[in-house]
Amino acid sequence: MSHGTAAVSIHRLPDDPGRRQVARRIAHVSGPVLWAAAFATLVALAIYLRTLMPATGFWDTAEAQTVPPTLSIFHPTGFPTYTVLGWLWSQLPIGGVAYRMNLLSAVSVACAAGLTVLITSHFITERSRWLVAAASGVAGLAFAFASEPWENALRADVHAIHIGLAATIVWLVVTWRTAEQVGSPHPGRWLAAAALVFGLSMGNHPLTGLMAFAIGPWLFIVDPGIWRRWRLILACAALLVVGLLVYLYIPIRANISPEPPLFYARPTTWEGFRYLVFAEQFHGLFDQFANPLDFLAGKWDKAESVLAAQLVGPGWLVVAMGAATLAVRRLGAFAFLGLLVVSNIFYAMNFEDGDIDRYYLLSTLVACVLIGVAAAALAGGGARAVAEATRRTLDFAGRRRAASIAGAIVIGLAALLPAVALATRYEVRDQSDNREADLWVTSVYRALPQDAVIISWWSYSTPLWYHRWVLGDRPDITIIDERNIIDDGWSTIDAAIRGHLGRRPVFLVPPDWEVERLLSVFRTRPVATYGGYTELVEVLP
């Protein structure tokens, strides 16, 4: 008898009726897998806490640190789920508000690592519970210390919450499949929960919508007759709508006095709401979708460079092995994960965002799931081979020990992927001393005279806002962002400068693309501030 046949299968229901009911209720989540998920979550969180940005950031980071605690309005698409969740989280008595919002990202990505463990366990066909748990744990840690997840875990950003919610959706729909297969009571509840989370996740980031291209086919892979289950379909549709109702935050908040400190696009009307939620400002970023296959080689080169950076060493070779294994053993699951990746990469390749790397988080999660599948298959195959090879030389107990050692060696080798990633990326990813934005804002505020107007652009406006509206610094000054000039009625930077020049001191952090023109149109003098960033200038009458 080989080690493989000696092990108890977690995919086989026990004969005892009472134990069968327990197995149905937990939908095949074994104790070792739960421990592995908890371990991956806690290890990831511990490392994230050691490397977490402690303070304010530039760009979208400071906006994500400012909007929730002040109950303001985000840039398109509004991200109301993040706002509401962030406001609740910002009430925690832990550090400063900026730190709390950064911590929210760390917790979300760490939870995604734990969910990666649970997801992976559903796709592994090996019988040993401990092997499933160990291989799934490797998958979770591989995700935790992949390049983009780790980077996004250290700063406030909607994408960190997105991957946590996306992982939750994937886990719920694959658990629904298992619950259906084993005859768990009320398996549709898992799918209904996924629908609710899907709606809420759309309120965090519409990137969630791409998951429908995989979830739709998955429903019919699991149950070809699901279209007849109209009660379940209606329940899921209703819960999806309930989740989407989070978007009501935007018009409600926009029409409550006093108006929010950050009031992007002033969505007090249907036109303003539509402009914000449907990202009409950014329609130009979608131009590539008119001809998505144009310049495909160049687009793929960029996507490949992002994806290649996520894993270390032979990581992608192991991913390919996992994909091949899953395609042979569970073609439907392979199709589901493949559609998640294809839709994600296709969109990211054609969308021109300032930090497009964040959009590949879900593809990275799927890749790490496949690492776990490959590790389990290799370990299980190795264990069976050793058990067979020692059939004539060892007794049953000896063969089992030898097989276990062989499997453990393979898992240990697979664990080198996250271990090497942790060791080699720690210094690069460490943001624990990053207080650059705070130092810059402090120097700027120190340089501004009483009642000054400062006209800035997005990367710099956001930390200025945080210090003004969250910390209460310099209530005498007016901060005008080069985009929000439109909402404030100035139309252009030039008009805003001329509207205040001679009445109030005017200072400018010129946008990179406007520096030369603005400095040639207006008389200015440089103002000394914290170095290394765009120069602050005073506009002279």
Question: Where are these predicted regions, by residue range?
Answer:
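Perimembrane helix-loop-helix junctions
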Residues: 177-178, 183, 210-241
